[in-house]
Amino acid sequence: MNPPTDQDKPTLLLVDDDEAFRKVLARAMERRGYDVTTAPDVPAALAVAQQQPPEYAVVDLKMPGESGLVLIEKLIELDPNTRIVMLTGYASIATAIEAIKLGATHYLAKPVDADQVVAALNK
């Protein structure tokens, strides 16, 4: 059996303004078989997604400039089938409900690890 090529790997857009967290989670997700693209904020994430909408997205709620909620809405407009997990260090029921209404499939409170993210993406 041949190892999966990048074309066979599911695409994942990881958006978080915390560079250290972003790098660690990106490496962990790559080891779990995802083709990961990262972005530090909403404008950079949209630039990537408009070129190729991701199959999966992991989006931080609080980032400089626009909120992750704005990004969720725009990602769903690009491709309604994108599975999105919202991450936040500021968990609240109201925000979780808003994220789900906008199209997120799951909501996780930080700190999280890659196994939790994979489980949420696959629910």
Language-model regions: role of each:
Residues R22, P64, T88, S92:
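The feature encodes the CheY-like receiver
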Residues A47, L69-N81, E98:
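Short amphipathic alpha-helix used as the core "switch/output" element in two-component signaling
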Residues D16, D60, T88:
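Active-site residues of response regulator receiver
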Residues K23-R31:
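Charged docking surfaces used in two-component/phosphorelay signaling
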Residues G33-P40, V48:
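Short hydrophobic/Thr-rich beta-strand motif most characteristic of the beta2 strand and flanking loop
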Residues D41, S67-V70:
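Acidic catalytic/metal-coordinating carboxylates
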